[in-house]
Amino acid sequence: MRSKGRARKLATSNECAYGNYPEIPLEEMPDADADGITSVPSLHIQEPCSPATSSESFTPKEGSPYKAPIYIPDDIPIPDEFELRESTMPGAGLGIWTKRKIEIGEKFGPYMGEQRSDLKDSSYGWEILDEFCNVKFCIDASQPDVGSWLKYIRFAGCYDQHNLVACQINDQIFYRVVADIAPGEELLLFMKSEEDPHEPMAPDIHEERQHRCEDCDQLFESKAELADHQKFPCSTPHSAFSMVEEDLQQNLESESDLREIHGNQDCKECDRVFPDLQSLEKHMLSHTEEREYKCDQCPKAFNWKSNLIRHQMSHDSGKHYECENCAKVFTDPSNLQRHIRSQHVGARAHACPECGKTFATSSGLKQHKHIHSSVKPFICEVCHKSYTQFSNLCRHKRMHADCRTQIKCKDCGQMFSTTSSLNKHRRFCEGKNHFAAGGFFGQGISLPGTPAMDKTSMVNMSHANPGLADYFGTNRHPAGLTFPTAPGFSFSFPGLFPSGLYHRPPLIPASPPVKGLSSTEQSNKCQSPLLTHPQILPATQDILKALSKHPPVGDNKPVELLPERSSEERPLEKISDQSESSDLDDVSTPSGSDLETTSGSDLESDLESDKEKCKENGKMFKDKVSPLQNLASITNKKEHNNHSVFSASVEEQSAVSGAVNDSIKAIASIAEKYFGSTGLVGLQDKKVGALPYPSMFPLPFFPAFSQSMYPFPDRDLRSLPLKMEPQSPSEVKKLQKGSSESPFDLTTKRKDEKPLTSGPSKPSGTPATSQDQPLDLSMGSRGRASGTKLTEPRKNHVFGEKKGSNMDTRPSSDGSLQHARPTPFFMDPIYRVEKRKLTDPLEALKEKYLRPSPGFLFHPQMSAIENMAEKLESFSALKPEASELLQSVPSMFSFRAPPNTLPENLLRKGKERYTCRYCGKIFPRSANLTRHLRTHTGEQPYRCKYCDRSFSISSNLQRHVRNIHNKEKPFKCHLCDRCFGQQTNLDRHLKKHENGNMSGTATSSPHSELESAGAILDDKEDAYFTEIRNFIGNSNHGSQSPRNMEERMNGSHFKDKKALATSQNSDLLDDEEVEDEVLLDEEDEDNDIPGKPRKELGVTRLDEEIPEDDYEEAGALEMSCKASPVRYKEEDYKSGLSALDHIRHFTDSLKMREMEENQYTDAELSSISSSHVPEELKQTLHRKSKSQAYAMMLSLSDKDSLHPTSHSSSNVWHSMARAAAESSAIQSISHV
């Protein structure tokens, strides 16, 4: 049995050991001793009448300050032989004084009170312990009308003052007299053990929570220590507790005896005395533990801050406030005033008007009044039970500890413990529709031409090309998926999303908002066999714009496979050869991707300069259209004949699908330029009108549009400044809508094509066009001269420099349509041309396309749909009835509105507060959610003041300024002299040295090969993807001849490709990758000197390029480099490498192209060969390159086309890349 609050009950005595210390109150209870209730009949208390009680003996008492007037409660009956008056213990209040002599052995009790689980006031209660020293329950007598007169017996301040001890007998507390008590003396209870007679602080302050041994009265900090102590017999006599129970004779007669018994072992830290060495050693463990709260004026430390504060009062002697009526001292004047009100003048001055009960404080009276008014302001949130006191509510709420999830959300079924948490959850849950099977768009809208969307029909629509559902397997996802986890499409997108999942005004007009062209004009404008109709979606203008500036080079293709051309067509041969993707007027890329410039300033600046360049499109096509009009009509005869057979929507789907396939073909030509064309097969089987790539998705990608939706009359010439201050998106929209010009001429024209004798030959300057080559699109930024006119190279600048052009030779044309520039929205990681983890290049791709529902919500195709939808909104101003037409179509592109609900498995229990309304991801803090939302919205609020780059995260902006502009690299590697901007990057770099990955040796493991190959591949992929970005995002350069345009693209622009790649991917790369790219940028500047070798982390560079004038030699070199790479032992890995054998040496061709730019000599060219490269490193580069290229192709792939499959070089490249990526995915898992 022990008292829970002994430390707070302790008060120092002004007579013994505490004379030198100011009295420190440990707790003041306003109503501790002064609550009066008349519910119990009171006994009349007489004055002391014992014969032994003389006036002399009471003189000091009467003359002491304790005789100050205090309130004597009469609610508890006091026996006649005792009286209740001021205690001699400072701060204790009232005490029990005897009127007669009490001898040793008398018992008083039991201690009365309420049985509770815990003590409300530890000064008026006891804890009842079981045999294992566990608290069974508590006896609480803190209420004024509860308990017996025993609760007024106070604890002694010193050991020699006590005359009573307490013991527990049968779950009851009794007091036993252990010393003779003379009349007029106060009954004082045993408090401290005999080893603490002179310690200024109570034992509980040092030991926090004591556990007493009933045999020797030794205190322990934990029950485990007490149990260990009780395993051995105690060396000290039995304590007073055991004496009461066993009726033993009290033999502790003097303090000197205790000194002899307990003075053997002293603690050097706290001066405590222990009976034996074992107890002292256990006690010393408490000093070895680190205590969090240490006193700054003495070496003492405490585990609780309250104990430290209480201890520091002993040092702050000048900050005490003494009571004038008693010896009590306070550290705060408010505590002193509260003490005076409750114990002295004006005590319990607040009386209840209803029952007359008085209270020391107004708050106590206010709380008491709730009883009379039946007001219960404290309500349980779980069961809505109400209480008048908050403590009662807290006690009640513990009952709900085992059933905290009692309230269920009616919408999603999630359980909550309180109504407040449920209400917070409903903000995100109510009004949502959970994912369910069914069409994504308007209900009842079926795909034109197909009664049902089953797997068989999808395969048939794709013309035997395996769709993505077949590609990823049939047992992983339901049948009819256009991409993983997506049900079928309806209305060109059946079953992609549940209807009503997003809310947005309909965007697709049911009928053309503008008048169409005549059939003759359409026939003239349909230049590509893949384009059955002239209209091209406005969302596809970015790639088209870049196509005009950077035609991908295809000169390294074997010419012997090209059809024969007539002599009249030779002036166009060079142009056609250089741009395999130039039959494309418009390619759709989702804004926000890294295939285009993602920063807001780049978007706006490009937009301003595009208008000047693109308005000249029609002129260049008019100059070339006459020889091609007949052929265009013939090649599209089948499609035009189908107009009378199929519905308009089917024709429109065919047209749009062809446009997208052309887009893919354009990107493929760039990839083929960098990845090389060696190993491609079936080029001689190419046919006119063939699909450039197998359909990656079995259904048409874009929605259907009517045939006459996009008329594009000629534009007039108007000059705009090349570089202006960036404008806000709203200003850009105003500028676009206010202009009468269209940013792009979407008219397409096809050149006449005739067969050419097969055989190796160099490309000549005579114009001719192969039937397999896409048409050359000449946008306003590129002049289409008939010869090989040379112009000055493009300057190294992100925005380019305006060049002179033969603008006087171009007929002007009018524009009636203006399309809104796309704003970044979905920044899907598949578009972010980031450096994938070198350990598994295909991991990000697998994660993107194999993730569970609802990952398809942000598939790259959906990003393209969103961009297209945004651009379609710009048509609302073209025609008065356009807005009505837009509203007549079901909502298809409601991507901006939050989903109605998310699947229950996505809703986390609790913390539903910060949930992404687009993808359902949950974040612990609002700042994390804000940063995450920028990945959906494309917002980049942090703009660099030096280069107008924008970032979505402020830390990326700071790193950009520090590393790019300030060139701060204070951390230098002592092994290779490489510098880093951060210490962590240097440490990561040094680990590569330690692991041997920086040596470039062939003895490293495949994992280390991947790491060491990353730096080599960085330059290649940066060059490749930078050109694609320029292909998409830049239209600020003057016209160039075709040959010099290629030199510009791979020449001077090659110097800033690393910086541009860094700026485009700064938000996506980690710190080391940013540092690496900055270093690569500096290295590229050194490469401007022709013939200067390039260093790349101590590894031999692999990039080789083929001079344009030595095509035959380059082709022979590439053929000689086709030695089979060393295979890994894994069988599945062999298939992955063999599938990509045709792009093994894309790095070699890249270096050859660079040497062409720098005009390497033949000797230098022959000295560079891929034979110097370890085969294992080649395989690493092949795996990474194929995954990067495959991701690029996959993001722009069409789902279906109505044309037969072709075997063009681009088609073969894409088909094999896809198969290799599939096998490599399996290999990557097994490899890891």
UniProtKB/Swiss-Prot annotation:
<dbReference type="GO" id="GO:0060039">
    <property type="term" value="P:pericardium development"/>
</dbReference>
<keyword id="KW-0597">Phosphoprotein</keyword>
<dbReference type="GO" id="GO:0003677">
    <property type="term" value="F:DNA binding"/>
</dbReference>
<feature type="cross-link" description="Glycyl lysine isopeptide (Lys-Gly) (interchain with G-Cter in SUMO2)">
    <location>
        <position position="737"/>
    </location>
</feature>
<dbReference type="GO" id="GO:0042803">
    <property type="term" value="F:protein homodimerization activity"/>
</dbReference>
<keyword id="KW-0862">Zinc</keyword>
<feature type="cross-link" description="Glycyl lysine isopeptide (Lys-Gly) (interchain with G-Cter in SUMO2)">
    <location>
        <position position="557"/>
    </location>
</feature>
<feature type="cross-link" description="Glycyl lysine isopeptide (Lys-Gly) (interchain with G-Cter in SUMO2)">
    <location>
        <position position="1134"/>
    </location>
</feature>
<dbReference type="GO" id="GO:0032259">
    <property type="term" value="P:methylation"/>
</dbReference>
<dbReference type="GO" id="GO:0001701">
    <property type="term" value="P:in utero embryonic development"/>
</dbReference>
<feature type="cross-link" description="Glycyl lysine isopeptide (Lys-Gly) (interchain with G-Cter in SUMO2)">
    <location>
        <position position="294"/>
    </location>
</feature>
<dbReference type="GO" id="GO:0071425">
    <property type="term" value="P:hematopoietic stem cell proliferation"/>
</dbReference>
<feature type="cross-link" description="Glycyl lysine isopeptide (Lys-Gly) (interchain with G-Cter in SUMO2)">
    <location>
        <position position="789"/>
    </location>
</feature>
<feature type="compositionally biased region" description="Polar residues">
    <location>
        <begin position="806"/>
        <end position="816"/>
    </location>
</feature>
<feature type="cross-link" description="Glycyl lysine isopeptide (Lys-Gly) (interchain with G-Cter in SUMO2)">
    <location>
        <position position="549"/>
    </location>
</feature>
<feature type="short sequence motif" description="CTBP-binding motif 1">
    <location>
        <begin position="743"/>
        <end position="747"/>
    </location>
</feature>
<feature type="zinc finger region" description="C2H2-type 10">
    <location>
        <begin position="971"/>
        <end position="993"/>
    </location>
</feature>
<feature type="cross-link" description="Glycyl lysine isopeptide (Lys-Gly) (interchain with G-Cter in SUMO2)">
    <location>
        <position position="525"/>
    </location>
</feature>
<feature type="cross-link" description="Glycyl lysine isopeptide (Lys-Gly) (interchain with G-Cter in SUMO2)">
    <location>
        <position position="879"/>
    </location>
</feature>
<feature type="cross-link" description="Glycyl lysine isopeptide (Lys-Gly) (interchain with G-Cter in SUMO2)">
    <location>
        <position position="1055"/>
    </location>
</feature>
<feature type="region of interest" description="Interaction with SUV39H1 and probably MAPK9 and SMAD3">
    <location>
        <begin position="191"/>
        <end position="442"/>
    </location>
</feature>
<feature type="cross-link" description="Glycyl lysine isopeptide (Lys-Gly) (interchain with G-Cter in SUMO2)">
    <location>
        <position position="1151"/>
    </location>
</feature>
<dbReference type="GO" id="GO:0030900">
    <property type="term" value="P:forebrain development"/>
</dbReference>
<dbReference type="GO" id="GO:0005737">
    <property type="term" value="C:cytoplasm"/>
</dbReference>
<dbReference type="GO" id="GO:0051726">
    <property type="term" value="P:regulation of cell cycle"/>
</dbReference>
<dbReference type="GO" id="GO:0006954">
    <property type="term" value="P:inflammatory response"/>
</dbReference>
<feature type="cross-link" description="Glycyl lysine isopeptide (Lys-Gly) (interchain with G-Cter in SUMO2)">
    <location>
        <position position="687"/>
    </location>
</feature>
<feature type="cross-link" description="Glycyl lysine isopeptide (Lys-Gly) (interchain with G-Cter in SUMO2)">
    <location>
        <position position="369"/>
    </location>
</feature>
<dbReference type="GO" id="GO:0070828">
    <property type="term" value="P:heterochromatin organization"/>
</dbReference>
<dbReference type="GO" id="GO:0008270">
    <property type="term" value="F:zinc ion binding"/>
</dbReference>
<keyword id="KW-0007">Acetylation</keyword>
<feature type="cross-link" description="Glycyl lysine isopeptide (Lys-Gly) (interchain with G-Cter in SUMO2)">
    <location>
        <position position="1186"/>
    </location>
</feature>
<feature type="modified residue" description="Phosphoserine">
    <location>
        <position position="626"/>
    </location>
</feature>
<keyword id="KW-0539">Nucleus</keyword>
<feature type="cross-link" description="Glycyl lysine isopeptide (Lys-Gly) (interchain with G-Cter in SUMO2)">
    <location>
        <position position="733"/>
    </location>
</feature>
<feature type="modified residue" description="Phosphoserine">
    <location>
        <position position="1039"/>
    </location>
</feature>
<feature type="cross-link" description="Glycyl lysine isopeptide (Lys-Gly) (interchain with G-Cter in SUMO2)">
    <location>
        <position position="1058"/>
    </location>
</feature>
<dbReference type="InterPro" id="IPR036236">
    <property type="entry name" value="Znf_C2H2_sf"/>
</dbReference>
<feature type="modified residue" description="Phosphoserine">
    <location>
        <position position="742"/>
    </location>
</feature>
<feature type="zinc finger region" description="C2H2-type 6">
    <location>
        <begin position="378"/>
        <end position="400"/>
    </location>
</feature>
<dbReference type="Pfam" id="PF00096">
    <property type="entry name" value="zf-C2H2"/>
</dbReference>
<feature type="cross-link" description="Glycyl lysine isopeptide (Lys-Gly) (interchain with G-Cter in SUMO2)">
    <location>
        <position position="624"/>
    </location>
</feature>
